[in-house]
Amino acid sequence: MSSCVSSQPSSNRAAPQDELGGRGSSSSESQKPCEALRGLSSLSIHLGMESFIVVTECEPGCAVDLGLARDRPLEADGQEVPLDTSGSQARPHLSGRKLSLQERSQGGLAAGGSLDMNGRCICPSLPYSPVSSPQSSPRLPRRPTVESHHVSITGMQDCVQLNQYTLKDEIGKGSYGVVKLAYNENDNTYYAMKVLSKKKLIRQAGFPRRPPPRGTRPAPGGCIQPRGPIEQVYQEIAILKKLDHPNVVKLVEVLDDPNEDHLYMVFELVNQGPVMEVPTLKPLSEDQARFYFQDLIKGIEYLHYQKIIHRDIKPSNLLVGEDGHIKIADFGVSNEFKGSDALLSNTVGTPAFMAPESLSETRKIFSGKALDVWAMGVTLYCFVFGQCPFMDERIMCLHSKIKSQALEFPDQPDIAEDLKDLITRMLDKNPESRIVVPEIKLHPWVTRHGAEPLPSEDENCTLVEVTEEEVENSVKHIPSLATVILVKTMIRKRSFGNPFEGSRREERSLSAPGNLLTKKPTRECESLSELKEARQRRQPPGHRPAPRGGGGSALVRGSPCVESCWAPAPGSPARMHPLRPEEAMEPE
């Protein structure tokens, strides 16, 4: 479920905001149908929904372009999830111009940031500063993920309105859905909304499958494997809701209709897109590669500390934010594990970034952390050379080169020997001798021989555990229309029985309300009962009480307490003496 989400600043930043913000009169008129879709009307539209939505924060006028087909996962089919855009005509065109790295860095500094001694951008307006910044402060706790219970979709002239989100152009495409640029009218912020098709998830995953052979045991190491593609999405959502790190993309909101096909996930928009395209004739300099690779190390260390294996690290999944730092995205094939490492047995991810042990025909189980380290090595190679170390158009030949071909470095550009040593140790074909993340953090090239030390694990990581209950409750489902109608009818009839079964409930006698048979009698009721008992003792033995309603004082006749004490129960013989208070307390 890999999706490459990237964006470039638009040449006209004000236009999309006016189009999406709904400032004009025509826009306000088009929003009136959304106000009318409250209550049952809005629920009736749920039956037409066929998606999950994921949204990511983005800046006004941003677009996202796709990575190359070779960078996409093996399962990608390139098909778009169908989305109702009836009545849509011309869609607003977002600029396709990309900024160079020099323009990006200059634009970041012009926005009010400054550089520290290590060349990192310090942005005081952000909720947190870069970890290595001298002005760094503890990060604020992340905003909790919103779980929407109601969804309404309205088609407009050039876009689709989904709750408070206005969906615009497609900015990315993955194996199981598309990513849309979304504008939130409540907070005036752009997001990236991921629309997933449940049917496509199940179909491309090959479900239903045959059960495993008898006697098959799960792989040791405590690796949690989802039972199916839908459960895998829910696990991804539960993981993303807990992650809070400057170098990991954040999940904002999730919407789900259990009776329809689509799931909607909303992510923060990382506006500058992927760190680079592969292949490219303009690779990064060593200083730029070191800057981004330090962020990648901190993000991977945080994920491994949270017991998560990403399994799809590549440049197209490393998105550059406003502050110039990268964020790791796309957890569609990630694995959660227990213990010290994940022992995996399946092969997922992008072919050019797969480790040789995952392609071996003899090795059945392999380390999850070592897979991420190999992918980090291929990514660093791409940073400085603009291409993958092992390439072939035929997938089987590519697998053969990854497993057996020796690592070679091009003559140009000329890189430092320390960098060659680091890449060689990360691309060691033997996972047992391959370098690990704690050793990478201390490598001379990464730290510039001690001049730029990375933060310790305690400073960079805080453990967050995801329970099975949180995975089950990762998405709040929207109730179906029939259920809502049934509940509202039961509330209106004040009955817990099914109002559509045709049987009528027996009418209750007005002479003995249930609350008067169970609640404690008041002082007025007790005094009136004592008065009646005294009057009965003074009357002759053969005297009968006067018929109900046929005389007596107005106070006694109008008192509901006396009415309940004197009234006979339905279907029972009339009593010849009044009820005592303790008798009135006992329900029949």
UniProtKB/Swiss-Prot annotation:
GO terms for cellular component: cytosol; neuron projection; nucleoplasm. Ubiquitously expressed with higher levels in the brain. Intermediate levels are detected in spleen, prostate, thyroid and leukocytes. The lowest level is in lung. The modification Phosphoserine is found at residues 100, 114, 129, 133, 137, 495, 511, 572. Autophosphorylated and phosphorylated by PKA. Each isoform may show a different pattern of phosphorylation. It catalyses: L-seryl-[protein] + ATP = O-phospho-L-seryl-[protein] + ADP + H(+); L-threonyl-[protein] + ATP = O-phospho-L-threonyl-[protein] + ADP + H(+). Disulfide bonds: none annotated. SMART domains: S_TKc. InterPro entries: Kinase-like_dom_sf, Prot_kinase_dom, Protein_kinase_ATP_BS, Ser/Thr_kinase_AS. Residues 475-500 are annotated as: Calmodulin-binding. Keywords: Acetylation, ATP-binding, Calmodulin-binding, Cell projection, Cytoplasm, Kinase, Nucleotide-binding, Nucleus, Phosphoprotein, Serine/threonine-protein kinase, Transferase. GO terms for biological process: calcium-mediated signaling; CAMKK-AMPK signaling cascade; cellular response to reactive oxygen species; MAPK cascade; positive regulation of autophagy of mitochondrion; positive regulation of DNA-templated transcription; protein autophosphorylation; protein phosphorylation. Residues 472-477 are annotated as: Autoinhibitory domain. Activated by Ca(2+)/calmodulin. Binding of calmodulin may relieve intrasteric autoinhibition. Autophosphorylation does not alter activity or regulation by Ca(2+)/calmodulin. In part, activity is independent on Ca(2+)/calmodulin. One of its GO terms (molecular function) is calcium/calmodulin-dependent protein kinase activity. Residues 1-14 have a biased composition (Polar residues). Its EC number is 2.7.11.17. The modification N-acetylserine is found at residue 2. Calcium/calmodulin-dependent protein kinase belonging to a proposed calcium-triggered signaling cascade involved in a number of cellular processes. Isoform 1, isoform 2 and isoform 3 phosphorylate CAMK1 and CAMK4. Isoform 3 phosphorylates CAMK1D. Isoform 4, isoform 5 and isoform 6 lacking part of the calmodulin-binding domain are inactive. Efficiently phosphorylates 5'-AMP-activated protein kinase (AMPK) trimer, including that consisting of PRKAA1, PRKAB1 and PRKAG1. This phosphorylation is stimulated in response to Ca(2+) signals. Seems to be involved in hippocampal activation of CREB1. The autoinhibitory domain overlaps with the calmodulin binding region and may be involved in intrasteric autoinhibition. The RP domain (arginine/proline-rich) is involved in the recognition of CAMKI and CAMK4 as substrates. Interacts with calmodulin. This is Calcium/calmodulin-dependent protein kinase kinase 2. The lineage of its organism: Eukaryota, Metazoa, Chordata, Craniata, Vertebrata.
